Amino acid sequence: MKRFIYIIAILSLASCSFLEEDPQGKLTTEGFFTNASDLDASLNSLYSVVATSQQQNNFVGTDFLHGDDISTHPASNKQSLREFDQYTVADNNAWMQTLWEQRFKVIKAANFIINNASRTPDVAQEDIDAAIAQAHYWRAFEYFYLVTTWGPVPVMLSEVIDYNAPLVSEEKIYELIISDLKTAEAGCPVTYSKAPYFQNGVNVAVSQAAVKATMAYVYMCMAGWPLNKTEYYEKAADKAWEVIQGTMDGTYYYELLTAFSDIHSMAHNRNNKELLLGIYYNRDRHPNAIPATDYLLEMAGGWGDTQGEIKFWKEFPEGPRKTATYFPKLMLNGTLQDWWYDTDPASREVVAPIFMKTVESDVRGAEYDYTSGKACPSNGEKTVQVIRFSQVLCWYAEAVGRSGKVTAEAVDALNRVRNRADGAVTDMYSTAMSPEELAEAAYNEHGWEVAGYYWSGFATRARDMFRMYRYKEHFEYRVANPLIEVAPGVFRKEAVPVTGSWNDSRMYAPYPYTDSAVNPSM
């Protein structure tokens, strides 16, 4: 326990800005990594820092609001969120600052292991390699977040802070990400053999399959904007297929859960075999602040941070997936209403569909009942779902299509996802599709699979739109903000106004002022 506290102290020294550390306060790593307990403590600490970085939405980010699936409140205390929803982010955006600093806290924790763990004595080399591999994964994960949110950023590969670190280009950062992921792929086990890395029949720590899946999506992003190196689509397809084939030959245990409603259920919260990578929480020891964030202020206990965009909801195919994604009805003033309900004259500030993936019951372990009218707890323990197997199936199909091909395997992968979404074997996709049709179908299916779910900050709908350079199209749609018929004779539109004209600077967030004021390169 003392070792764990000591390493937490080392890794928590970063101030509000990662560039504002006092160099006189730098601690030496000498005296650590002297035995197996130190190695375990360093990993436990890394995962604690990772969990903290995802435990509330001002840590995990706000760039997800660029997506066409999700919006925010037009007033209240949501200015930091609205700026992202409107593509007009200021460099003093308070939430962006925490988003930025959390990424570098994880990077610092990962660097601590990468640069020091190899000297641990009396530990099997396999265990050392696995620890270092996991650290490389999380460093890659955070640099992926940084490069897709800010573009060129400083690169820190040690615990020493360089106050004059130059900005590194997107291409070079992607090279670092792939290098880190290749190290992780070589060192992360297929299945862990002991707790806490393996619990309830699933990997809790980063596994080989999770790394391969991550590489597949990173390659897809490298094939898209801004690098536009389309040859990477074939690499993405190959890497996604390695995961899929591994589930077919028994190398990996991952599978699609039978019903979409199972995915975010409490029954599968800690033993979800569709989940390639999750971040786990406990209400008593390390809770998250997720349950109340994403439903309306006027619902019991809601924080009203996000709601669904109307056009996306309208185009979302009906079926069990849609039913499990959005509240079927909203409890408003003690009465269940359709989301488009309003008083006469109109009085509701936000009239929009509401996502239901992150809510939790006030009774621990019970499934949430949207008809009860009871508030969600402020402290939650739903697992943050970083990558699911259904996403890998979509990525495979899209990457095959964007490579100019249509294969039976890609079509089958996409039908597996859609059949579950429909709750029946519809097999709506076929090899008669063109490559472009296959790619767009997979892109859409992935969007519907992850709609409104931004907690890992990895392959969100916004990230898909970023790599396909579709922010501009959505920005112009939001400027127009047309009325949409959501029920016979009932028309609604977005509550948050978007104005101005497009330029590509809106693709990225500005660097936080607190850091750009310190580093002249920013």
Language model segments and positions:
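Acidic, glycine-rich segments characteristic of secretory precursors and extracytoplasmic regions
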Residues: 16-66, 97, 112, 518-522
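Elongated scaffold/linker segments in the mid-to-C-terminal portions of large proteins
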Residues: 37, 43, 47, 52-54, ...
